[in-house]
């Protein structure tokens, strides 16, 4: 294969081997960037539509030109595919989905955890303390449900800022949709009972709730409380007209489903998880094997190791019997608050879940093997480009990230011939240098990484090639760092984007000053871009986390009288430092543990005022 031969993707051939089952498909670029996530009622038909004929628009043309591989996940039905698609888009932010799709998340019903709980529709991060029911497939169903809950159970929907400042009942009370807990029209015991009934309703325990309502209705009738009995009758009628549950999948409760596929000495363990009846999607694991283990042995080893780290659900379904299952059940049950059951040869719906996991494990393994073959082609192209005699076993790449010298972080990512080795990634918090000095940061990071390897004599952890994100200056600093720790057998290569800073136009810089220009279509450059971009991603996420932590805590920690507990109360109350800074002194003083004098001190410190100026500002406001 020549060095400049691009890796092409035969979409028609890929689609021809897919099933007509519903599912989700993902498209990837050469550097493993996720381009697009979509759902399909019939995977083969939907995927084939992308590659039959001319693309309908320039966006689609541009996207398909970048595709080098695809993954698919089979689901039980299209509704599950819809939810899984949304979860992947929200968590992975594919390049083309972000531009084109509605970025709303699926709605939940939120029941807050307060003395007088509030019920409301909720989207987005689940940061408000309380219980979240869902996700639901559409907002209309949630609004209809909330309308029924307000009408029959009369829970409040107002924000706390409104609730705390009411002096008389609002319009919701007047039209019979709220019991006015804000002004104590309803007793706390009665309101708590209403909350309990709403919880049963949202949990899908309509039968249990109906029995309670029938008994309460009989008691009301016996006591001649006919209006109360009529209200309970209406509530019972409404309950029976509603579905027990409106989750996308509310049948599985809490359980994990595991299946193992093996081929050509490689294995894949697929985990399908359900929590509170919600399909959380799949995760794929590719354990290293010697090629001789049976799938049952691989699965047994996985179960033992995985659930030693993560708490198991009450029920774990397997695609086959595994060795030591009785021992594993006993061990898991002893360390858990509930009994753990490992099951196989199941029937009904659970058999369908196992079959689903088996099919997805087979597809995932096939896709992984194809991806590894492509990665080996790129790795071999790098070897040829750099003139190495032996196949590449390990490469590393360093990058630096900071904001105007603040919170500098260096990253080191590791790749072998078949892809990233994430367990060996490292970050280095850079200290003791002039802020913004990238050269000093690079030198410090490389010295720290290789000094440890030299001290521990870890020859196997030394890379064949060390890529540096930068030009000749950064490359020189890397060489100085290696010399300082006595490492000589590592090939250093700088990766420079040049003046135009366009992807595909990178220049590779060698220590002797030689420059290589592989070209955008080169598999070697595609491999190097993937490594470099991963180093950049890993550095910038570490930098942002460090910067956020510094900004969230240091300004409050510097204020006399603010300890860890008061700082936590402030950040929790206002949702972060930005919220504290935006608040007035009166609002700050309402936080638990914050006096009026301390609130003035906090306000002054965050706004660069003297304490007297802060007091005056408070009087003016």
Curated annotation (Swiss-Prot):
UVR domain boundaries? 207-242
Q: Which GO terms describe its biological process?
A: nucleotide-excision repair; SOS response
Cellular component, GO, one term: excinuclease repair complex
The record's gene field reads uvrC
Q: InterPro entries per the record?
A: GIY-YIG_endonuc, GIY-YIG_endonuc_sf, GIY-YIG_UvrC_Cho, Hlx-hairpin-Hlx_DNA-bd_motif, RuvA_2-like, UVR_dom, UVR_dom_sf, UvrABC_protein_C
Q: What does this protein do?
A: The UvrABC repair system catalyzes the recognition and processing of DNA lesions. UvrC both incises the 5' and 3' sides of the lesion. The N-terminal half is responsible for the 3' incision and the C-terminal half is responsible for the 5' incision.
- Where in this chain does the record put each GIY-YIG domain? 20-98
User: What are the protein's UniProt keywords?
Assistant: Cytoplasm, DNA damage, DNA excision, DNA repair, Excision nuclease, SOS response
Q: Name one GO molecular function term.
A: excinuclease ABC activity
| Annotated localization | Cytoplasm
Q: Which organism is it from?
A: Xylella fastidiosa (strain 9a5c)
This protein's superkingdom? Bacteria
List, alphabetically, the PANTHER family matched: UVRABC SYSTEM PROTEIN C, UVRC/OXIDOREDUCTASE
Q: Which family does it belong to?
A: Belongs to the UvrC family.
Protein name as annotated: UvrABC system protein C
Q: Name one Pfam family in it.
A: GIY-YIG
Per UniProt, subunit arrangement is: Interacts with UvrB in an incision complex.
């Amino acid at each position: 294969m020549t060095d400049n031969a691009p890796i092409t993707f035969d979409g028609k051939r890929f689609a021809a081997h897919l099933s007509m089952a519903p599912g989700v498909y993902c498209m990837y670029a050469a550097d493993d960037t996720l381009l697009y996530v979509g759902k399909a009622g019939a995977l083969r038909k939907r995927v084939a539509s992308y590659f039959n004929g001319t693309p309908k628009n320039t966006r689609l043309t541009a996207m398909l030109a970048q595709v080098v591989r695809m993954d698919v996940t089979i689901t039980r039905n299209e509704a599950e595919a819809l939810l899984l698609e949304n979860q992947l888009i929200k968590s992975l932010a594919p390049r083309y989905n972000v531009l084109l799709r509605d970025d709303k998340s699926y709605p939940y019903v939120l029941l807050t955890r307060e003395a007088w709980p509030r019920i409301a529709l909720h989207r987005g991060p689940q940061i408000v303390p309380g219980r979240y029911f869902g996700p639901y497939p559409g907002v209309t169903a949630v609004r209809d449900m909330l309308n029924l809950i307000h009408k029959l159970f009369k829970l409040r929907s107002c924000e706390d800022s409104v609730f705390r400042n009411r002096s008389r009942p609002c319009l919701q009370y007047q039209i019979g949709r709220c019991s006015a807990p804000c002004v104590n029209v309803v007793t706390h015991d009665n309101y708590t009972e209403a909350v309990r009934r709403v919880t049963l309703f949202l949990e899908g325990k309509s039968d249990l709730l109906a029995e309670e309502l029938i008994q309460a209705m009989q008691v009301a009738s016996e006591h001649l409380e006919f209006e109360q009995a009529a209200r309970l009758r209406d509530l019972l009628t409404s309950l029976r007209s509603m579905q027990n549950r409106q989750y996308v999948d509310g049948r599985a409760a809490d359980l994990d489903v595991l299946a193992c596929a093996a081929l050509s000495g490689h294995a894949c363990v697929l985990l399908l998880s359900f929590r509170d009846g919600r399909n959380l999607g799949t995760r794929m694991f590719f354990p290293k094997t010697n090629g001789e283990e049976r799938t049952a042995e691989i699965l047994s080893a996985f179960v033992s190791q995985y659930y030693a780290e993560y708490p198991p659900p009450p029920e774990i379904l397997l695609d086959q019997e595994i060795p030591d299952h009785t021992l594993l059940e006993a061990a898991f049950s002893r360390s858990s608050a509930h009994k753990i059951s490992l099951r196989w040869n199941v029937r009904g719906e659970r058999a369908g879940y196992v079959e689903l996991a088996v099919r997805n494990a087979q597809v995932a393994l096939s896709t992984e093997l194809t991806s590894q073959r492509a990665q080996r082609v790129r790795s071999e192209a790098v070897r040829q480009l750099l003139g190495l005699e032996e196949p590449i076993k390990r490469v590393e790449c360093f990058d630096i990230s900071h904001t105007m010298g603040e919170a500098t972080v260096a990253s080191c990512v590791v790749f072998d011939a078949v892809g990233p080795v994430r367990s060996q990634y490292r970050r280095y918090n850079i200290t003791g240098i002039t802020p913004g000095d990238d050269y000093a940061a690079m030198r410090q990071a490389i010295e720290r990484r290789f000094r440890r390897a030299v001290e521990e004599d870890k020859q196997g952890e030394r890379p064949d090639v060390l890529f540096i994100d930068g030009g000749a200056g950064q490359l020189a600093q890397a060489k100085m760092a290696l010399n300082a720790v006595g490492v000589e057998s590592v090939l250093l290569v700088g990766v420079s984007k040049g003046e135009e800073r366009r992807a595909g136009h990178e220049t590779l810089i060698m220590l002797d000053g030689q420059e290589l220009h592989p070209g955008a279509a080169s598999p070697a450059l595609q491999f190097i871009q993937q490594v470099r971009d991963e180093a950049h991603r890993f550095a910038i996420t570490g930098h942002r986390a460090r910067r956020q932590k510094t900004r969230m805590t240091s300004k409050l920690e510097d204020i006399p009288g603010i300890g860890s507990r008061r700082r936590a109360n402030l950040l929790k109350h206002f949702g972060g430092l930005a919220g504290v800074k935006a608040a007035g002194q009166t609002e700050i003083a309402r936080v638990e543990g914050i006096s009026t004098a301390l609130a003035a001190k906090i306000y002054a410190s965050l706004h660069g005022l003297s304490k007297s100026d802060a007091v005056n500002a408070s009087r003016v406001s």
